[in-house]
C-alpha cells in the first residue's frame, strides 16, 4: 500500500509544500561551451529524439550535439560550460536541457540555439530531469530535493520544498527548527531530502524515482505526492510503462522491479548482474533494453519478465539510449554509439 504521512506531521510543514520565489539568473556570468571537434566522443549523459528525423545528445562541458542519422553530429551553440544531464523536447521546436550549476536551458528552434532560463551555481546542486505538461507548465528536479516549477514556459522558475519525501522523525525535527530559524529550516529541509533522479509523465499521472528507494506518483503534476510501497533501499534511476502497460523501475546493483498494478505490488526479475542500471529503452516491437555500467546491456523479449545479457566488449558505461530508425543509439562515457544487436 502507498505510504502516507499522518495528517498531523504533514500539517506541521504545510501538507503539500513550502514554495518560495527564486531568481532565475545568478550574478555569476557563465562561460559559453567551446566547440569541440570530438564532442560526440566525449562523456554524454542523455540522448533523445526530436520528432522522427533528429537526435540530440547532451553531456560534459555544456556539449549539445545534433544528428539526423546517429552517425554524423554537429554541435549547437550553448551559453554554458556546465555538464548537462538531461534533454527534453515537448515538441519539434520547444526543448529544455538541465544540468550542473542548477542550469536550465531553453530552445525554441529544435535545439539549434539555446538560452539560459536558470543558472544558480551557488546552489552547488545539479538538475537530473525535466518534464513539461504543457508548453507553459514544467518541473525540473535534481540533487537533495532540488525541485523547481514554471507556469510560464520557463520565463520564471519557482523553488518548492516537498515534505512528503522526508521521514516522520525528521519532519518533527524540521517543524521545531522552522519556528526558530526559517533559513536554517530551508537548508536542513534540503539536506534531509533524497536525490530526485527521474520523472515520467504517464497520462495524467507523474511518477518520480530517486534515492533511498523512492517511487512516488502525483495526479496533479507534482503539487501533491503519494509514496508507493518501499521495495528497495538503494537508488532508482528510471521508470517506464511498457507496451503491455506494466511498470518497470531500475537502479543500483542490477535491480529491476516490475508491477502489473501501477505500483501497488511488485515482482523482481533476475538480471544476473550487479551493474548499476541507468536507463530503459523500449523498441517499436516491444523489446526492452536496459543500459548499465561496465558495458552491460540487458535485453527482454517478454515485457520485462526475464533478461538476456549482451555485454559490450569495451566495458564502458551505457548511460542513456533511444530507439531510432530501427537502431539502438546510446549516449555513453565515450560518446555516441550505435549498438549492434
Description of each model-found segment:
Residues 10, 19-20:
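Cleavable N-terminal signal peptides
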